[in-house]
């Protein structure tokens, strides 16, 4: 897969272009008198070191760009890589099947679990079909239906958060967007089965929180979680989206800051360069964290789970 490089990764992109060029020359003419393998190896090492140096000092805006990377793994990628026997379940049994939310039953290391997550889509047609990962009310009602099913069958719930926010269209508002989100918050706080939530990309406002009330809340290293996008915040405060980098720093949208504020429990480290560089390794780390979280929650009673989760939700907004 050819990598898409972000603006701040251009020095890495230039090195990788040199490596690709040398590799192509080597393949085209195997009778070259010169051995370029050593030079390719040297450039690869230099690329790794440069990547390590750049990623050691990322700002919040750069992390926000990584969270939106077009090649970043989405919910269905992690379902394929970390789970077995996934059976997707569709529809809210009231209006429609919202493709921006996917969900179904799968096995995690042999154990049945209910998976629910946002799905953005990659190609243009799929992005439109998934509404760019912005759910309508029927998406959140589908999610709630699956959560209630999981409770009936005593299955842990695992959610993957990756959305710029709930869809703000007129039709969505007419069908009760705010009510659907609010109902999910209330009902998730009352579930008697373990709930583990992981932000895998963008965690945008109520659209993220509507499937984000859990006993354990994790974030991938280069994901974000905020009440509004940096561009939206900048447009309100400075009347210009160009101030988005400044807004991103001020909002505290990155995982270390959110863990410091006790809004999340764990930060799952990503492969060097981000999850899109090695989805398989990222899925393995994510799976290990989910299994560890389930082991911690299995020893708690149903009442303890509900009480702890409710108190956690009520603590949001307090320093």
From Swiss-Prot:
Gene Ontology cellular-component terms listed: acetyl-CoA carboxylase complex
Localization: Cytoplasm
PROSITE patterns xref list: COA_CT_CTER
Main location: cytoplasm
Top-tier EC class: transferase
Keyword Lipid metabolism among UniProt keywords: yes
Disulfide bonds: none
Record keywords: ATP-binding, Cytoplasm, Fatty acid biosynthesis, Fatty acid metabolism, Lipid biosynthesis, Lipid metabolism, Nucleotide-binding, Transferase
InterPro entries referenced in this protein's UniProt entry, alphabetically: Acetyl_CoA_COase_a_su (IPR001095), ClpP/crotonase-like_dom_sf (IPR029045), COA_CT_C (IPR011763)
Top-level taxon of the source organism: Bacteria
EC number: 2.1.3.15
Pathway connected to this protein: Lipid metabolism; malonyl-CoA biosynthesis; malonyl-CoA from acetyl-CoA: step 1/1
Known partners and oligomeric status: Acetyl-CoA carboxylase is a heterohexamer composed of biotin carboxyl carrier protein (AccB), biotin carboxylase (AccC) and two subunits each of ACCase subunit alpha (AccA) and ACCase subunit beta (AccD).
Protein family (similarity comment): Belongs to the AccA family.
Protein name, per record: Acetyl-coenzyme A carboxylase carboxyl transferase subunit alpha
Species this protein is from: Citrobacter koseri (strain ATCC BAA-895 / CDC 4225-83 / SGSC4696)
């Amino acid at each position: 897969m050819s990598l898409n490089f972000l603006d701040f990764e251009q020095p890495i992109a230039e090195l990788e272009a040199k490596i690709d060029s040398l590799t192509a020359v080597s393949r085209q003419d195997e009778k070259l008198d010169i051995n370029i393998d050593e030079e390719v190896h040297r450039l690869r090492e230099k690329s790794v070191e440069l990547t390590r140096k750049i990623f050691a000092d990322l700002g919040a805006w750069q992390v926000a760009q990584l969270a939106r990377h077009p090649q970043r793994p989405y919910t269905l990628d992690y379902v394929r890589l970390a789970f077995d026997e996934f059976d997707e379940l569709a529809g809210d049994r009231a209006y429609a099947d919202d493709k921006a939310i996917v969900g179904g039953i799968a096995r995690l290391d042999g154990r049945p679990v209910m998976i629910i997550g946002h799905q953005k889509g990659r190609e243009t047609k799929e992005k439109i079909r998934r509404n760019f990962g912005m759910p309508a009310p029927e998406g959140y009602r589908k999610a709630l239906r699956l959560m209630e099913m999981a409770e009936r069958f005593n299955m842990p719930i695992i959610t993957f958060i990756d959305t710029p926010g709930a869809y703000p269209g007129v039709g969505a508002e007419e069908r009760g967007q705010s009510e659907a989100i609010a109902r999910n918050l209330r009902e998730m706080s009352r579930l008697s089965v373990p709930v583990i939530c992981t932000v895998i990309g963008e965690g945008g406002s109520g659209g993220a929180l509507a499937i984000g009330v859990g006993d354990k809340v994790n974030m991938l290293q280069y994901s974000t979680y905020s009440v509004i996008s940096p561009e939206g915040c900048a447009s309100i405060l400075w009347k210009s989206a160009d101030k988005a980098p400044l807004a991103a720093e001020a909002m505290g949208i990155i995982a270390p800051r959110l863990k410091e504020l006790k809004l999340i429990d764990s930060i799952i480290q990503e492969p060097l360069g981000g999850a899109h560089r090695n989805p398989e390794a990222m899925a393995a780390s994510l799976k290990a964290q989910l299994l560890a979280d389930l082991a911690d929650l299995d020893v708690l009673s149903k009442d303890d789970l509900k009480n702890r989760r409710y108190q956690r939700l009520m603590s949001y907004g307090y320093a």
